[in-house]
Amino acid sequence: MKSTSKIYTDKDSNLDVIKGKRIAVLGYGSQGRAWAQNLRDSGLNVVVGLEREGKSWELAKSDGIIPLHTKDAVKDADIIVFLVPDMVQRTLWLESVQPYMKKGADLVFAHGFNIHYKLIEPPKDSDVYMIAPKGPGPTVREYYKAGGGVPALVAIQQDVSGTALQKALAIAKGIGATRAGVIPTTFKEETETDLFGEQVILVGGIMELMKAAFETLVEEGYQPEVAYFETINELKMLVDLVYEKGITGMVKAVSDTAKYGGMTVGKFVINEDVRKRMKEALQRIKSGKFAEEWVEEYGRGMPTVVNGLSQVQNSLEEKIGNQLKDLIQKGKPKKS
C-alpha cells in the first residue's frame, strides 16, 4: 500500500508567488463562485469568464467579481482555471480559450478528466496543474469565511516554469485548502479514483444497494413506508457518523445486534463476486473505455442518463420517499 508522506499546509505555500497575476476563473457555478470569491478575498486579481450574459453574469457582478466573455477573460490572464463541467471543457477550450489565451499562461483544473483522457491537449509552454477540493463549492466558501478550509488534492501535469507546484499551492492557499491540508497526487490517480468512487459507491453502488434492499422487503410483503425508513432514510445518520467519527466510530455507535448482523451478513452480501465486479469497473476506467463511452453518450444527448433518471423518479421508493418528506421534516427541531 502506497501512502504519501507529505501534506502541504499554510507554511508550505506563499500567495506572493501569484500576486499581481491575473486569474481567470471559467464558470460561476458551485465551485467557480466559491473559488472566485475566496481568491478575491485573499487579495488576488480575479475575473470570471462566461460564455454568455445571464444569471451567472449578474450573480458575479452582485458578488463584486468582474464577469467577462470567456475570450476576453483569457486573453490577458496569466492563470486560467477551468471550473465548468467536464463535458463542456473540451468545446470551451477549442472555441474560446486556446485561440485567445496568452502564450505561456497556466492551465488549472479541479478534476483531471479532460487532461488525463487527452480531451484537452495543452500547449507545451504552459504549466498545467490541479487543485481538487474534497467538498462542494458552498462548503469551500463557508469554511473559508469561517477561517477554515476544505482539504484538497494537488497534481502537476506540466512544469515548464519549474514553479508549478509553488503556484498550485498558492492557488490552494487562496481558496483556503492549505488551512486544512493538501495531499499530492497525479492527474491519473485523481481521475481514476474519483470516477471509481462515483460509480461503485457514492452514486451507482449506494443507489442500487438502497433500491435492492427496499425492493427485497416490499416483495416479501413488508409495508413500503417501513421499508423506506429501514433501507434508505436511516442511511444519512450512519453516513454522518462515518464522516464525524470514521467507520470504527460508526460501528461503536450502533447496537450490538447491528454490529453482529453487519459484520456477518455484510460480507455475505458484499462478497468476492462484488469485489471482482469492482475491479472490472476499475479496469474500464483505467483503459479509457468508460471515458470513450461517456463522451459518445454525452454527444447523443445522454439517453442512458435521461432514461435512468426517469426510472428513478417513477420508482416506488421515490414515491414513498416523497410522501414521507413532510413527516420527516415535521420532526426536525426548529432552528432558533
From Swiss-Prot:
<feature type="binding site">
    <location>
        <position position="234"/>
    </location>
    <ligand>
        <name>Mg(2+) 2</name>
    </ligand>
</feature>
<keyword id="KW-0479">Metal-binding</keyword>
<dbReference type="InterPro" id="IPR000506">
    <property type="entry name" value="KARI_C"/>
</dbReference>
<dbReference type="Pfam" id="PF01450">
    <property type="entry name" value="KARI_C"/>
</dbReference>
<feature type="domain" description="KARI C-terminal knotted">
    <location>
        <begin position="186"/>
        <end position="331"/>
    </location>
</feature>
<dbReference type="GO" id="GO:0009099">
    <property type="term" value="P:L-valine biosynthetic process"/>
</dbReference>
<feature type="active site">
    <location>
        <position position="111"/>
    </location>
</feature>
<comment type="pathway">
    <text>Amino-acid biosynthesis; L-valine biosynthesis; L-valine from pyruvate: step 2/4.</text>
</comment>
<dbReference type="InterPro" id="IPR014359">
    <property type="entry name" value="KARI_prok"/>
</dbReference>
<dbReference type="Pfam" id="PF07991">
    <property type="entry name" value="KARI_N"/>
</dbReference>
<feature type="binding site">
    <location>
        <position position="255"/>
    </location>
    <ligand>
        <name>substrate</name>
    </ligand>
</feature>
<comment type="similarity">
    <text>Belongs to the ketol-acid reductoisomerase family.</text>
</comment>
<dbReference type="GO" id="GO:0009097">
    <property type="term" value="P:isoleucine biosynthetic process"/>
</dbReference>
<dbReference type="InterPro" id="IPR013116">
    <property type="entry name" value="KARI_N"/>
</dbReference>
<dbReference type="InterPro" id="IPR013023">
    <property type="entry name" value="KARI"/>
</dbReference>
<keyword id="KW-0460">Magnesium</keyword>
<feature type="binding site">
    <location>
        <begin position="28"/>
        <end position="31"/>
    </location>
    <ligand>
        <name>NADP(+)</name>
    </ligand>
</feature>
<keyword id="KW-0028">Amino-acid biosynthesis</keyword>
<dbReference type="InterPro" id="IPR036291">
    <property type="entry name" value="NAD(P)-bd_dom_sf"/>
</dbReference>
<keyword id="KW-0521">NADP</keyword>
<dbReference type="GO" id="GO:0004455">
    <property type="term" value="F:ketol-acid reductoisomerase activity"/>
</dbReference>
<comment type="function">
    <text>Involved in the biosynthesis of branched-chain amino acids (BCAA). Catalyzes an alkyl-migration followed by a ketol-acid reduction of (S)-2-acetolactate (S2AL) to yield (R)-2,3-dihydroxy-isovalerate. In the isomerase reaction, S2AL is rearranged via a Mg-dependent methyl migration to produce 3-hydroxy-3-methyl-2-ketobutyrate (HMKB). In the reductase reaction, this 2-ketoacid undergoes a metal-dependent reduction by NADPH to yield (R)-2,3-dihydroxy-isovalerate.</text>
</comment>
<feature type="binding site">
    <location>
        <position position="194"/>
    </location>
    <ligand>
        <name>Mg(2+) 1</name>
    </ligand>
</feature>
<comment type="pathway">
    <text>Amino-acid biosynthesis; L-isoleucine biosynthesis; L-isoleucine from 2-oxobutanoate: step 2/4.</text>
</comment>
<keyword id="KW-0560">Oxidoreductase</keyword>
<dbReference type="GO" id="GO:0000287">
    <property type="term" value="F:magnesium ion binding"/>
</dbReference>
<feature type="binding site">
    <location>
        <position position="56"/>
    </location>
    <ligand>
        <name>NADP(+)</name>
    </ligand>
</feature>
<protein>
    <recommendedName>
        <fullName>Ketol-acid reductoisomerase (NADP(+))</fullName>
        <ecNumber>1.1.1.86</ecNumber>
    </recommendedName>
</protein>
<dbReference type="InterPro" id="IPR008927">
    <property type="entry name" value="6-PGluconate_DH-like_C_sf"/>
</dbReference>
<feature type="binding site">
    <location>
        <position position="137"/>
    </location>
    <ligand>
        <name>NADP(+)</name>
    </ligand>
</feature>
<feature type="binding site">
    <location>
        <position position="230"/>
    </location>
    <ligand>
        <name>Mg(2+) 2</name>
    </ligand>
</feature>
<feature type="binding site">
    <location>
        <position position="194"/>
    </location>
    <ligand>
        <name>Mg(2+) 2</name>
    </ligand>
</feature>
<dbReference type="GO" id="GO:0050661">
    <property type="term" value="F:NADP binding"/>
</dbReference>
<feature type="domain" description="KARI N-terminal Rossmann">
    <location>
        <begin position="5"/>
        <end position="185"/>
    </location>
</feature>
<keyword id="KW-0100">Branched-chain amino acid biosynthesis</keyword>
<feature type="binding site">
    <location>
        <begin position="86"/>
        <end position="89"/>
    </location>
    <ligand>
        <name>NADP(+)</name>
    </ligand>
</feature>
<feature type="binding site">
    <location>
        <position position="198"/>
    </location>
    <ligand>
        <name>Mg(2+) 1</name>
    </ligand>
</feature>
